[in-house]
Amino acid sequence: MYRIGIGQDAHYFEKGKKLYLGGEEFDIGYGLKGHSDGDALLHAITDAILGALAKTDIGTLFPDKSKENKNRNSVDFLNKALEIMYDMDYSIVNLDCNIIADKPNISSVRDKIIESLSRLLSIPKDNISIKAKTKEGYNKEDSLEVVCIALLQKMI
């Protein structure tokens, strides 16, 4: 049996923060504003997994009003979704993600992000797609958005 889920997240940029994408840290002078570390890619992946399982969402599991989640590493969120997934005897077949932003240049860090996700998700790099899209002027806000689709398969 297969299940498919979609996850989405968006954050504004904030100067002076480190940027976290896919569990990797980039010190480029700005990061993503958020209650946690702001890793929009991991947030979207987490929600895609939870959605495929027809379970709760990241905001319910880890409320942004909770002091416990302040500056929390988004890998914790992903690990909880993976725990739920494994408990239900599912595994990830593949992941397809779009990062929509005018900055940073995703093509220069894509391989590093895919390597990180491969390690975190325990799936081959060939099963992970990270695509960069620009906003084409439709939104002048200084932000980054991610949309991910996760395909899961029941383990035999």
UniProtKB/Swiss-Prot annotation:
- Indicate yes or no for the key word Lyase: yes
The UniProt annotation places 4-CDP-2-C-methyl-D-erythritol 2-phosphate binding at D9, A10, H11, H35, S36, D57, I58, G59
Q: List the disulfide bonds.
A: none
* UniProt-listed Enzyme Commission number(s): 4.6.1.12
Q: Where is this site: Transition state stabilizer?
A: H35, T134
Q: Which reaction does it catalyse?
A: 4-CDP-2-C-methyl-D-erythritol 2-phosphate = 2-C-methyl-D-erythritol 2,4-cyclic diphosphate + CMP
* Gene3D superfamilies referenced in this protein's UniProt entry, alphabetically: 2-C-methyl-D-erythritol 2,4-cyclodiphosphate synthase
What family is it from?
Answer: Belongs to the IspF family.
What does the UniProt record say this protein does?
Involved in the biosynthesis of isopentenyl diphosphate (IPP) and dimethylallyl diphosphate (DMAPP), two major building blocks of isoprenoid compounds. Catalyzes the conversion of 4-diphosphocytidyl-2-C-methyl-D-erythritol 2-phosphate (CDP-ME2P) to 2-C-methyl-D-erythritol 2,4-cyclodiphosphate (ME-CPP) with a corresponding release of cytidine 5-monophosphate (CMP).
Q: How is this protein organized at the quaternary level? A: Homotrimer.
Q: What is this protein called?
A: 2-C-methyl-D-erythritol 2,4-cyclodiphosphate synthase
